[in-house]
């Protein structure tokens, strides 16, 4: 065993190398005990640790007890050593993280890109979603954790593997779904559009039929509330209406995807599989449906023109939208509220989405911003005032 001790501010950082066993556990204990009690805590870098026995585990347990409420973390743990921590239960009582596997995407085919990162094919079985540097690691870890939860809860989604580092960026490895999105299928085979929209409605209903336990998933209402400060070009009073509107929205525990557009649903052997699970959460299903309404209608192209987001004529997008709601609700959208009172939230939630999406950043341009401001002032604010009476 070899160890190196350095200090990051008042935090003791211990780098471990080799094996820790009964023959050197006392030396290990003496080194840890020599760290000043006034330190902010202890960070153990196990990148070079090859093995640890029960004697070494007990030394770690004693060190953690000495730290009390202060920081005590073990990082960069190999799979072999992590197995020891898992089997013994230490991973449940200590803050322990695995070492990040290092890869390269040099020579790999780039098969997609989105707002948060790019997707590369690693091999015939796996892909890597490689995030842009601006995306925080905590957000990446959350998306992976949510994808795993979704899979366990019965939501059809791609199997996620590990968080890795590739060419200086962080990524997540997923199984490769050898299929096309519903959007691609519609564009390539419009004669079967109704069949594809039926799959679309079926998978949406399935997700919304799954209920989470309280606290099991983030609240989509909270996710939306956190986005309100990013809205620009509105007065403080107008911004307060966005908060007041969310206060009115019913809170339920139905599972939501957060962005159920036809480009986020793959079809493999006649079954749907969801991708991009970063906003997997709970709330009224009308949140998901209102985002579909927003992206296809309110943020869509003028009729007769080409919709560049969906890569098809706007007339086809309109057909998909109305057919989708008819299959989801079992009746045309115009009649949905009669049999499904919760459908009354569809347009108000779509107006809200207009504000939080079109008034954020400069992606949409002045014409869309003007439309969103008009919707806020002539539709959403009067709606909130009417509910308060």
Predicted segments, located by residue:
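Amphipathic alpha-helical interaction surfaces in cytosolic regulatory modules
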Residues: 20-94
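Active-site acidic catalytic loop and adjacent metal/ATP-binding pocket
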Residues: 109, 118-122, 242-287
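Active-site Asp-x-Gly
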Residues: 268-318
């Amino acid at each position: 065993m070899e160890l190196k001790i350095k200090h990051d501010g008042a935090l003791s950082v211990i780098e471990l190398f080799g094996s820790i066993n009964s023959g050197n556990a006392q030396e290990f204990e003496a080194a840890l005990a020599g760290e000043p009690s006034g330190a902010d805590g202890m960070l153990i870098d196990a990148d070079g640790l090859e093995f640890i026995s029960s004697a070494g585990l007990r030394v770690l347990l004693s060190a953690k007890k000495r730290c009390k409420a202060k920081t005590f973390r073990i990082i960069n743990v190999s799979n072999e050593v992590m197995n020891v921590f898992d089997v013994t239960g230490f991973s449940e009582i200590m803050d322990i993280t695995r070492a990040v596997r290092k890869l390269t995407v040099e020579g790999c085919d780039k098969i997609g890109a989105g707002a948060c990162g790019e997707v590369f094919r690693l091999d015939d079985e796996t892909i890597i979603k490689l995030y842009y540097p601006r995306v925080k690691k905590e957000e990446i870890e959350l998306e992976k954790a949510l994808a795993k939860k979704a899979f366990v809860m019965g939501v059809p989604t791609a199997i996620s593997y590990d968080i890795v580092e590739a060419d200086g960026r962080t990524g997540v490895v997923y199984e490769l779904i050898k299929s096309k999105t519903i959007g691609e299928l519609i564009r390539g085979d419009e004669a079967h559009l109704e069949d594809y929209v039926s799959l679309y409605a079926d998978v949406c209903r399935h997700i919304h039929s799954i209920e989470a336990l309280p606290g099991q998933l983030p609240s989509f209402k909270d996710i939306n509330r956190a986005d309100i400060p990013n809205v620009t070009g509105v007065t403080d009073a107008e911004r307060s209406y966005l908060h007041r509107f969310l206060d009115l929205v019913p809170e339920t525990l139905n599972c939501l995807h957060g962005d159920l557009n036809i480009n986020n649903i793959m079809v493999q052997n006649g079954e749907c599989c969801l991708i991009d699970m970063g906003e997997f959460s709970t709330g009224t299903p009308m949140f998901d449906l209102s985002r579909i309404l927003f992206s296809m209608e309110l943020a869509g192209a003028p009729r007769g023109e080409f919709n560049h987001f969906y890569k098809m004529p706007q007339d086809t997008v309109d057909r998909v939208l109305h057919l989708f709601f008819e299959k989801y609700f079992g009746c045309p959208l115009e009649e949905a509220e009669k049999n499904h009172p919760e459908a009354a939230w569809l347009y108000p939630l779509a107006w809200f989405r207009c504000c939080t999406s079109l008034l954020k950043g400069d992606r949409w341009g002045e014409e869309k911003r003007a439309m969103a401001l008009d919707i806020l002032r002539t539709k959403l604010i009067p709606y909130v005032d009417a509910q308060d009476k």
